[in-house]
Amino acid sequence: MNTIDFLEFEQMKKNVAPFKVGDTVKVQVKIVEGDKQRIQAYQGVVISRQNGGIRESFTVRKISNGIGVERIFPLHSPILETVEIVTRGHVRRAKLYYLRKLRGKAARIREKKYVPIAK
């Protein structure tokens, strides 16, 4: 491991939720307004994940007042407080850009069935 990789590894967050594309997540974002700081929740569907390592980012899409809003978050950014998984989605694509064209019930994502393993 060279020096740059070592420095990047030190700055990466260790407790990142293992979410995937298609999952509905709630992202807690730090917002600084003047000298005040607050946390804002942003909930939506993960439509893509890009890159890897410290440069990794993900795009979350939600519908706000009938208008689709997408926001890109760097995964290891200090402005991200937490990423909480609300529901798991079952999709067959790595990028869900086709959701931009769909409206209403057509834009729904199947929920992944969770079956606990019996011992």
From Swiss-Prot:
This is Large ribosomal subunit protein bL19. InterPro entries: Ribosomal_bL19, Ribosomal_bL19_CS, Ribosomal_bL19_sf, Translation_prot_SH3-like_sf. GO terms for molecular function: structural constituent of ribosome. This protein is located at the 30S-50S ribosomal subunit interface and may play a role in the structure and function of the aminoacyl-tRNA binding site. GO terms for cellular component: cytosolic large ribosomal subunit. The keyword Ribosomal protein applies. Gene3D superfamilies: 2.30.30.790. Belongs to the bacterial ribosomal protein bL19 family. GO terms for biological process: translation. The keyword tRNA-binding does not apply. Keywords: Ribonucleoprotein, Ribosomal protein. NCBIfam families: rplS_bact. It comes from the Bacteria.
